[in-house]
């Protein structure tokens, strides 16, 4: 909720990097350690161990980032411990894809989720307050939009994708009714 007008918040995203916690944060000040973050990007997603290993092989540095916090930002930018690394998709056309595939197959059994899971736990811890605020705002909006309708007249358009899955979950939780058609 916008503190000025009381309306819905805008979905403008500025993502910062917490050097202490080694994860992206959605608030300028990390709610866990209190350190001020530096601007990172406007969109970010975790790089899973499989993609991380492939990236390392392409860069000719297998397992170089295994214990690091690796993220993908908008524009196919990769960040390792908050620093952008040099990587260009267009350079892939000069690589031997068969050799990359072979090396990946040889190394994938040594790949691990241990450090990735630790980073995800830290990311969730550092961003849970914002997540909870967004969920509560969404549930409040759903309740306000449905207050004049009978539950039997409601349904959620459901394709099975991640967006409709999240929407169905939010509607079910907001209205405390798992029977809503979707």
Where are these regions (language model features)?
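ATP-dependent adenylation/nucleotidyltransferase module used to activate substrates
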Residues: 1-39, 43, 54, 65-182
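Intrinsically disordered, low-complexity segments
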Residues: 46-61
């Amino acid at each position: 909720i916008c503190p000025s007008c009381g309306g819905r918040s805008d979905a403008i995203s500025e993502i910062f990097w917490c050097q202490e916690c080694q994860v992206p944060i959605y608030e300028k000040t990390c709610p866990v350690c209190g350190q001020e973050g530096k601007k990172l990007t406007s969109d970010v997603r975790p790089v899973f161990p499989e993609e991380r290993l492939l990236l390392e092989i392409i860069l000719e540095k297998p397992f170089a980032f295994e214990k690091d916090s690796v993220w993908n930002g908008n524009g196919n930018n990769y960040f390792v411990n908050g620093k952008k690394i040099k990587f260009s998709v267009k350079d892939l056309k000069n690589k031997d894809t068969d050799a990359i595939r072979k090396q990946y197959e040889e190394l994938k059994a040594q790949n691990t989720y241990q450090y990735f899971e630790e980073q995800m736990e830290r990311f969730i811890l550092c961003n849970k307050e914002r997540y909870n605020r967004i969920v509560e705002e969404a549930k409040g909006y759903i309740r306000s939009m449905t207050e004049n309708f009978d539950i039997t007249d409601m349904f959620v358009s459901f394709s099975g994708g991640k967006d409709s899955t999240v929407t169905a979950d939010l509607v079910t939780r907001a209205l405390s009714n798992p029977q809503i058609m979707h």
